[in-house]
Amino acid sequence: MGRLLEQISSSRDIRSLTFKQLNELAGEIRQVLINTVSKTGGHLAPNLGVVELTLGLHRVFHSPVDKIIWDVGHQSYVHKLITGRYKEFYTLRQFGGISGFPRPSESVHDAFGTGHSSTSISAALGMAIARDLKGEKYSVVAVIGDGAMTGGIAFEALNHAGHLKCNLIVVLNDNEMSIAQNVGAMSGYLTRLRTDPMYSRGKEEIEQLLRRIPIGSALLRLGERVKDSLKYLVVPGMIFEELGFTYLGPVDGHDLRAITTVLQHARARKGPVLVHVLTKKGKGYSPAESNPDRFHGIGAFDVATGEAVKKSNIPTYTEVFGRTMVKLAREFDNMLAITAAMTGGTGLTEFARLYPKRFFDVGIAEQHAVTLAAGMATGGFRPVVAIYSTFLQRAYDQILHDVCLQNLPVTFAIDRAGIVGEDGATHHGLFDFSYLRPIPNMVIMAPKDENELQHMLYTALSHPGPAAVRYPRSAGTGCRMDDSFKIIPLGRAEVLRDGTEVTLLAVGSMVCLAVKAAEILAGHGIDAAVINARFVKPLDKECILRYARRTREVFTLEENVLQGGFGSAVQELLSSCGERGVSVHCFGIPDSFVEHGNRALLLARYGLTVEQVVRAVLERFAQRRHPKKLKVVSEKA
């Protein structure tokens, strides 16, 4: 395995291979992908589907001189394997290893950092403009999937690129076969005709000639109408032509010769070109071919069977959310569910099956999802927008302007909040407390366990205004689930442990950690109170002030950035109430982007473990009891 792959480190090496060798290389790459992702987890099906396309791109274009931008970037594994990262590929998505997404800091071949959807065409257009302004000569290629083309920013960029007419290539990787019926003799003929240089030159000469004769313009318009009628009938790319692009395709994305030929034609063309490539998600691995959605993003699995390696029998927060939504649908007949191309990812598959008329997958259109929910709310419904924390950032203005300004009853179910692990900086949900907290009318909740999650969702749906419930990407605590729902009083914290010397004020995933830390501190003779804040907004003012005044030492714990987060809210409260004699120590994520790696490892790296919290409290008490002695020790250290 890897006989040819071991010799490949750049586009130059790809160009030296015959087509027979390239097909052999494609087989080697697929085997490496399957074996590696079965251990590390990752996006398998998308990468299996773009092996030949990636080889074709690197055969025609000269990376890193030519720029290849991968939309979302989850399908860039093949690109990484053939650009000098094969030997390190076993570290994929591991801490300190190869990222699962393009990172310019990792390789000069990663022209632009991606992770969120639909950004590639805008970035590629910007790079093409920069190239032209500097008088440089190289190609810029954006590779975007049909799913990502549902994002509004992609069409904004297409519209702008068509207007500017600069040299830009967009490769549409269509792995849904949604336009497969248009692949036929006439479509193939038109593609061959339009990629012929003689056709292009002849077309330009005829247009120039017609414009010189008196009735030429009328004939030209008539000819365009006839041509457009035929193209609408047989060519699936007419929309791109209308946007100002030359459309080439569809082409078989697993035929290396065909891909190479069409990309060569695209490179030779002037102006914006769209190449439509049809691929099969999961190609070459039967479990992924038969169930591409499950293998889109997957954890460790058994290669022989394709079955996931189950790490825990405890349901995840996502699974609990999905089950709760089904139960809530019986309680609230006006409840609707909305997601942005994440039906399975947000746990809504069963809800969608049982309540198809009450479920809406809007595609990769987070802004639309939120304002759609606002419209539904004005019509008397209670929409739940289920979305990952990192993707909700894309709809900030809609949250503020369309939902909160009008105080509409929209519930935001914010999945993947906090550190998500191996997907890294583009996917951690570390900012939602900070970006939601300043918005008037917004209620923000975070459950300590899965039982509290179901009650918070019920509370949010019973609340007359906007509310957000955020929860992590992890298994629950395994706690007992109540049989019936209950409303949690708005802004009411929960005292889990009384104490007189220090207050551990935690929210969400950090509550269990605080309880364990308090138990250890008790063994050291320190009486710690533990408060489950439940709400980041509104805070339980009475409870927080009572314990802050009693203990004078407060430690806040959150899985969010410190700037503007839960700890900041507590400090603001104490300051506004004149409590200047209280020491507040905030645990959370510092002012930095968190890299990829195992969730437990990353939590430890940023001080969010039981042991590190205990150590910090002990050091604080040692400092209070022996301030001079501790100061000497610190200076020596």
Swiss-Prot record:
GO terms for molecular function: 1-deoxy-D-xylulose-5-phosphate synthase activity; magnesium ion binding; thiamine pyrophosphate binding. Thiamine diphosphate binds at residues 74, 115-117, 147-148, 175, 285, 366. It comes from the Bacteria. Keywords: Isoprene biosynthesis, Magnesium, Metal-binding, Thiamine biosynthesis, Thiamine pyrophosphate, Transferase. Mg(2+) binds at residues 146, 175. Its EC number is 2.2.1.7. Its cofactor is Mg(2+); thiamine diphosphate. GO terms for biological process: 1-deoxy-D-xylulose 5-phosphate biosynthetic process; isopentenyl diphosphate biosynthetic process, methylerythritol 4-phosphate pathway; terpenoid biosynthetic process; thiamine biosynthetic process. InterPro entries: Dxylulose-5-P_synthase, THDP-binding, Transketo_C/PFOR_II, Transketolase-like_Pyr-bd, Transketolase_BS, Transketolase_C, Transketolase_CS. GO terms for cellular component: cytosol. It catalyses: D-glyceraldehyde 3-phosphate + pyruvate + H(+) = 1-deoxy-D-xylulose 5-phosphate + CO2. The keyword Metal-binding applies. Coiled coil: none annotated. Binds 1 Mg(2+) ion per subunit. Belongs to the transketolase family. DXPS subfamily. This is 1-deoxy-D-xylulose-5-phosphate synthase. It comes from Pelotomaculum thermopropionicum (strain DSM 13744 / JCM 10971 / SI).
